[in-house]
Amino acid sequence: MKYLPLLALATLASALPEKRATPYGIDVSSYQPTVDWTTVKNNGVSFVYIKATEGTTYISPSFSNQYIGATDAGLIRGGYHFAHPDLSTGATQADYFLAHGGGWSADGITLPGALDIEYNPSGSECYGLTAASMVSWIKSFSDTYETATGRYPVIYTTTDWWTTCTGNSAAFGTTNPLWIAIYSSAVGTLPAGWQYETFWQYADSGTNPGDADLFNGDAAGLSRMALGS
């Protein structure tokens, strides 16, 4: 979640989201190894996404403690996986994510896992894949996750990356909830296929640790999202 283009980061200064009566959230990783979850909850945060895995060789050393801490504080929480389509298949990475904290259960406090797919921080921006191959990779990850859990994963991305690296595919808009990253006062144009975003990452800093997010709905809607109803 730290690899947004510099141009996007430059727009962050003084940017605030549209005023909404909506649940606030955060997302964290090993960059935030120690989080005071009680304070986060008292600050009005309702949900959190926590980095679990990356590729097929990395497990966040902070994930377990962060997940337990968020649970104990009464937050709705879920895990996310940073994709590396250049290293292995989508199915292989979905299985790795599922095996290391990325699962879902209908307990009312677990969000479906999220696939974080964005510009490559260490190589070709589209990981060396054509748009068609990228769409196939994402579908492989998504279908594998859905088969295992009964839920399609949330897709975290930017409109710019999605347009560049998938050819602005509309293939996932009716199945996968969208978590859009745009550091501005409004979400702007969404990737093709999605009529609305489910989550919006609107800043990479704020009162709480990690990135700042909004759920597009009310508290009851967030609970339904966790339940899968």
Question: What is the role of each PLM region?
Answer:
Residues 77, 151-153, 178:
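Hydrophobic anchor at the start of a short beta-strand
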Residues 145, 149-164:
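Aromatic-lined carbohydrate-recognition surfaces of secreted/lumenal glycan-active proteins
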Residues 18-32, 38, 171-229:
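Functionally critical loop-and-helix segments that line ligand-binding/catalytic clefts
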Residues 89-92, 163-171:
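Glycine-rich, charge-decorated loop segments at or immediately adjacent to ligand/cofactor-binding or catalytic sites
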Residues 1-17:
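Fungal secretory targeting signals
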Residues 28, 50, 115-117, 155-158, ...:
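Conserved beta-strand positions
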Residues 18-148:
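Substrate-binding cleft of extracellular glycoside hydrolase catalytic domains
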Residues 98-114, 119-121, 167-196:
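Structural recognition of alpha->loop->beta junctions
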